[in-house]
Amino acid sequence: MSSFKTKVPQVGRAQCSESHLDASSLMDSGGDKKSTFRKLKPPTTKIHIATYNCRTMRTDDHLEELEEELRNIKWVITGLCETRLPGEKRTTLKSGHTLYQNNSETNYSQGGVAFIVHRRIEHKVTKYHSISDRVIYLVLQINSRYRLQLIHCYAPTSTAHDEQIEQLYEDIAYAKNLENTHYV
């Protein structure tokens, strides 16, 4: 037992027999990859984004089924396609989540897009706007410096006319250029 060193050797103090065991003398200088005192990263929040083709949400039963299914997955924002809900509006659901929807008033038997935003981050939504019954976007204020723009689209099938596909691409480009955000 007497062969163990009880004192930590100090560089440049060969004459002095005293060892300094206080925290400041044992602190790592930070030059190595395996530094013991690393700077802590600021806390981050993960945004879980999901998409779902619901085929219809005309009745309240369909909406309740969707809310029940969302309880089983991790999500913060869910983009919905083919909702078939009339009009462009913002609705607060029974669960406290918010539904942002868009479809034409006259032809709501097909198409329609929407976002469901979790009640935890609903206060971060600064703007939502629909370009057509196939394209909608949402702007989130991530922090005091950055904003995030989410564009959700319902693409036509491969058998659709080229005009419909070109119109979709034009709508997406228009939505992208409409907002001045750091991230899209």
Where are these regions (language model features)?
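A shared catalytic/ligand-binding motif for oxyanion handling
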Residues: 1-184
